[in-house]
Amino acid sequence: MSASEFLRKEHEEIMRLEKLVTKCSKSLYDGKDIPLSHIDKINFLIAEFLDSIHFTREEGSYFPCVASYDHLNQEIRALLIEHELSRNIAKQISENLKQWKKGLNKREPVARFLRTYSIFLIDHMQKEEQFFEKAEKEILSKEEEQEMLEQFQSISAIAEKVTSLLEDIDYLEEQDWAK
């Protein structure tokens, strides 16, 4: 397995989360009750899995390695801007969810920002897949791919965290509103 393949595998798990985000948003728009603790868990997964783990791997290792060849820099810049957009949408979900938990009716904004996040994820994952393809074919050596993969896998605490986060996705997928 290469670093590119590893990130692609994470994308598969992220798309499981995207399906949950979509179903949650649709259920909220349809007036169905979803426990706020479940929406909290989705919000936590966005913050931890996407931002703290996946985006950090890309921003800390993968993108700098590709950029060191002074190639695909515009694509990297666009993806970094999109990562920031992701953080901003997630912040809106979080802020509206906090207000909802305090008793304000924030169902619609939470549903809207979840829907926005879902649309973002689908588009962003496709762009990253195309980027990985180019980087893999045109730039990165097998040695660089292997070195980054070892870096991704080296911190066992992160591997344990990912396992825990995937269990959270499993749990949410089993909820009535997610089926």
Residue ranges and their predicted role:
Residues 1-179:
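Small-residue-biased structural context
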